[in-house]
Swiss-Prot record:
Function: Catalyzes the formation of N(4)-acetylcytidine (ac(4)C) at the wobble position of elongator tRNA(Met), using acetate and ATP as substrates. First activates an acetate ion to form acetyladenylate (Ac-AMP) and then transfers the acetyl group to tRNA to form ac(4)C34.
Coiled-coil regions listed: none
Keyword tRNA-binding carried by entry: yes
UniProt catalytic activity: cytidine(34) in elongator tRNA(Met) + acetate + ATP = N(4)-acetylcytidine(34) in elongator tRNA(Met) + AMP + diphosphate
Matching Gene3D superfamilies: HUPs
Designated gene of the protein: tmcAL
Binding site for ATP: 7-20, 101, 160, 185
Protein name: tRNA(Met) cytidine acetate ligase
GO biological process, one term: tRNA modification
Locations listed in the record: Cytoplasm
Amino acid sequence: MKAVGIIVEYNPFHNGHWHHLQETKAKTAADCLIAVMSGNFLQRGEPAIVSKWARTKMALAAGVDIVIELPYVFAVQAAEQFAHGAVRLLDALGCQELCFGSESGDIAAFLTAAKTWFQHKEKFDSLVRSELARGQSFPKANAEAWRQLDSDALDLSKPNNVLGFAYVKAIWQNKLAIVPRTIPRLAAGYHDESFSHSSIASATSLRKVLRQTGQLERIAAYIPSTTAEQLQQYRLTYGRWHDWEAYFPLLKYRLLTSSEEDLRRIAGVEEGIEYRLKQKIVSAETFATFIAATKTKRYTWTRLQRLCVHVLTNFTKEEQNKAAAPTYIRLLGMNETGRRYLQQVKKELALPLIAKAAKLNGDPLYEQEKRATAVYTAAFPEPLYSAALKEEYATAPIYFSGMERK
């Protein structure tokens, strides 16, 4: 069976993701589609709107065959570390190809860019340092250095191009046999908050509408019915969807009661930002106003969000430095095709395949996952909090036997 990997967050799963799945299947002739998905906290430092279990159900209902979890230590990171963890997991599961969405839509541009980067890495790094010294944020310094290095370069001001470039580099750096492919993103950009297309909108815009109105019917045209069902069921069960404001009291407590020395141990805390965090948190009444007051050219909104997640989960620089590569494959869900594929390859897997998280106790990567889950589920009152914690440790992988969306 030919296995093709995709790297996803599904926050939530929408029609643009559906398009990506269909195009991936058509382009690659995949027999088995494997998604490596971020858990409860995401790459841009945000809590997922619903849990990884609800998002796994969305993915399986849409036709993904296997869903595995990208551990927290890779999921809540800048593009390079995020990509490194994700492609290593897909390789460990035997994926022959990786297909990602991008603004470019041209894999040749990514391959040429990666070749240029490897040939001129020292010059590129020097250009980045120069831009950082001028006060630019890392994403802008990266994009400007790339523009100076190659005038016909891939546009690295576009977020999905940045991720795609990181995937291709990670495949090359790790000397993996995975063949990268890309398809163009449809209509809405990653950060687009408008509804300019009749059926395609970004996850950012969908979350904004849900946060402001709480009305699922306002986004019904942009998501599959199975996504709507999962969102509705989650709110009925747990009384809410997740956003940063739910965690702001906990963050404020952590920052007020941590010393500057404590904060300097946390991953991402550099260049004296700990003083600014403690200064700005005192008068901040919402997460949004806190980040707006704290951000600088160097410390962007996204970088601060990731840092704040690490503060909540007490994820240290030491732990980050030790997290060199995934140590397990955690299975979140599968359908019959996925079950047959795993049966076929299970003796050849490069990492242990884990169905029940209890077997991972003591693994450093999973110990961090437990802390992330304890934070994520703290948005619930008791007894829901304890029930959600138990779900993390006791839930078996979801087996989906229903029909795909037509």
